[in-house]
């Protein structure tokens, strides 16, 4: 059975990420209206809007030495891909190694919406909080105005 084209899109994103080819991800795989949601209480958590914000987020993941390996991936219907991946990395004493699930909505052959589900949210929060500092409170409050 041939691989579903939407599965190929998500696999391509992982391959490009792991070899550091963020330009291909931005220009060929991401929709302009992309929304990427990452849960948690750490500096990288929250919704990212548009390809540029997601690529900036990916750049931070690269700095954190995170690696991702697909474990399982399947397409459902014409616009949905769900996968399980292992996310792992180490920076100093901060270590992350967890299986996560991600839901993708594909529109017009591009990734348009992503929701990540963390199997070890506490571990992810600790890992990213150990690496990245929060902006000072006045700067965070100013963003909300």
State where each predicted segment sits.
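C-terminal and inter-domain tail/linker signature
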Residues: 1-145
């Amino acid at each position: 059975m041939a691989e579903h084209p939407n599965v190929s899109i998500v696999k391509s994103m992982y391959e490009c990420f792991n070899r550091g080819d963020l330009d291909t991800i931005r220009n060929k795989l991401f929709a302009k209206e992309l929304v990427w949601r990452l849960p948690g209480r750490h500096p990288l958590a929250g919704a990212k809007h548009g390809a540029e914000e997601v690529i900036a987020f990916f750049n931070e993941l690269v700095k954190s030495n995170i690696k991702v390996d697909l474990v399982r991936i399947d397409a459902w219907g014409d616009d949905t891909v769900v996968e399980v991946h292992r996310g792992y990395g180490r920076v100093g004493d901060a270590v992350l190694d967890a299986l996560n699930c991600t839901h993708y909505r594909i529109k017009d052959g591009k990734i348009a919406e992503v929701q990540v589900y963390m199997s070890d949210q506490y571990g992810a929060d600790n890992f990213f909080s150990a690496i990245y500092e929060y902006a000072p409170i006045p700067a965070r409050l100013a963003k909300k105005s």
